[in-house]
UniProtKB/Swiss-Prot annotation:
Organism listed in the record: Bartonella tribocorum (strain CIP 105476 / IBS 506)
Name of the gene encoding the protein in the UniProt record: rplJ
GO cellular component: large ribosomal subunit
Record's protein name: Large ribosomal subunit protein uL10
Recorded coiled-coil stretches: none
PANTHER family (alphabetical): 39S RIBOSOMAL PROTEIN L10, MITOCHONDRIAL
Family label: Belongs to the universal ribosomal protein uL10 family.
Keyword Membrane recorded: no
Lineage top rank: taxon: Bacteria
Length: 172
């Protein structure tokens, strides 16, 4: 990479840090190419991204962002997992770490809050924004459905009574 490419990459990475809801930093030493591709595809499907960057460039890109406090995590072979949804990157990273012992989560950030390894794991156990939205819609629509059933019930009962009288008249 020449200087211009490095500047462009740092600018791009800085924007990614600013736009992301959460960032997870992990060591990936010993992972095979297929394992890395698997991680990238899982993260991409979930709406996040994985990037391997030189530590020095990542530290420069962190300057001026809310995530600046995690600069100390960038030692050794590190990668960055990030997503706009604060839950996605931690969830995918923790799930991947469970099946790959060479993938070690170092920590991360959510906005201006630095996250320890345990905090990243706790964050991963929470439902995502889409799951929360679905639950909220379900909670809101359920009472409306029940009200509609209660309002329509008397009309249905009247119709059944009239139908029963009609049956009796035909039988007699």
């Amino acid at each position: 990479m020449n200087r211009a490419e490095k500047r462009e990459f740092v600018t791009w990475l800085n924007e990614a840090f600013q736009k992301s809801g959460s960032v997870v930093v992990a060591h990936y030493s010993g992972l095979t190419v297929s394992q890395m591709n698997d991680l990238r595809s899982k993260m991409g499907e979930a709406g996040g991204a994985v990037k391997v960057a030189k530590n020095r460039l990542a530290k420069i890109a962190l300057q001026g962002t809310e995530s600046e406090s995690i600069a100390g995590l960038f030692t050794g072979q590190t990668l960055i997992a990030y997503s706009e949804d604060p839950i996605t990157a931690p969830k995918v990273a923790v799930d991947f770490a469970k099946s790959n012992d060479k993938f070690v989560i170092l920590g991360g950030s959510m906005g201006a809050t630095s996250l320890t390894v345990d905090a990243v794991k706790s964050l991963a156990s929470l439902p995502s924004l889409n799951e929360l939205r679905a639950k909220l819609v379900g909670m809101i629509s359920t009472p409306a459905t029940r009200i509609a059933q209660v309002v329509n019930a008397p009309a249905g009962q009247v119709a059944r009574v009239i139908g029963a009288y009609a049956q009796e008249d035909k039988a007699a």
